[in-house]
């Protein structure tokens, strides 16, 4: 290990010591380093970094206290001797090959450049199935539609099918329109957030406005056409902002859910926010009582906010009364986290919930009781998300940690098993926001979904992590969107509800993609193509509506408010081969 790696290792340890032996590590920079170095480190073991530090010979302050008595004279290691004498001990790092997957010596597994090398004692990292193949030669990597049963035309054998054909399919065009892939990077806001981006949402009426949340609880509003018009609200939540929904009757009112256990409503015009629900009124009393909120959706018919916590309970909020209705209802295994909620767009009383108890469940919110789910959809591992199709609500799309995207074509049919399972790389580690496959809200055929990819690909010597557009009816990969200027992973992706635009969140940055036209393709062949980026956040608002000057220093997340710092505009140019440079 070279001196650069050793210096970073020592710096991380020193920073942890200053904050105290029991403080959680500040992984702001560690997250971005993890993403940028994902092509050179294994992703299978989440705790390898700490394990390597302990095995390197460095001992924490508490480790030297417990030692069993022995009849023989105790041998004192150089590290312990140096600690007792107050001197700094040298760090010894072993160069022996150790597999981070099976912990055995003699071989290694993980990313080598842009190629993932499998552990010979484990199944394929992509499909999780034994079969003598590796991730590089996995048939699902060669062709994503491998083993997928395409959707077939339904036979109208029952009266319910006749109703479905006439009322629903009659509104869907028989000829599938050409889908425009937003595959050209239009602009980006570099390091807009101080922590990694966790959620994105387009404004329901202002086409050019994008809202984003991050791990620190900060809410950002950005006009990506005017580039420099952006506002951040830094006092809405105190930690991870997991979900946000607009009020259907007031497009200036936004509801947000956070891991601090609160639901807040923010007036985007005035910047004034108010708390609707607080599941931790007594503050932090340990992880056994601390409740976090991940899933949230809005029932527009009844004006209800549906909120699910990390203990498996569902809470109903009346937005008009700003009060909780009834008692919490257990909808998933007690003590398990509910990861997402989604109301059916055609029948809002039908609710789809997903959890880390390996199930997605369908409920009738008019008759909510424990163990009263219509059906429980079993999965192999944690279910990151579940969504009804955006037009008819008759399909279900789920994303599971077993590297499977599951599709149910008809919610009134047999739901014992999915209509198809699509193998896709989205099994992530602790430094990433969970991947979630989402429908394209503009697609009337209800077949197109978008999701980021974890395993990197080698594009002209650069390790890139594409954003995949998938045909859920066949499992076919429609397009993989990437740019040589973006080498980090993009787990958060949102398609515009009206325009052919894709927004992606990668680390602390946000990017906007648009379809590449024929004129753009001709222009790119003749000359270099320029893209505009904006660095740093601009105006910042507190929850009381007052503006505050922002700082672009993300080391401590503080802002001095003394001098307004303008966002820096950078123009990136790159050739067809992907070798880029920046001009300020």
Curated annotation (Swiss-Prot):
Expressed in proliferating tissues such as shoot apical meristem (SAM), root tips and young leaves. Not detected in mature leaves. PROSITE patterns: WD_REPEATS_1 (PS00678), WD_REPEATS_2 (PS50082), WD_REPEATS_REGION (PS50294). Residues 517-532 have a biased composition (Basic and acidic residues). A motif (DWD box) lies at residues 351-366. WD repeats lie at residues 192-232, 236-278, 288-327, 333-373, 378-418, 438-481, 484-523. The keyword Nucleus applies. This is DNA damage-binding protein 2. It comes from Oryza sativa subsp. japonica.
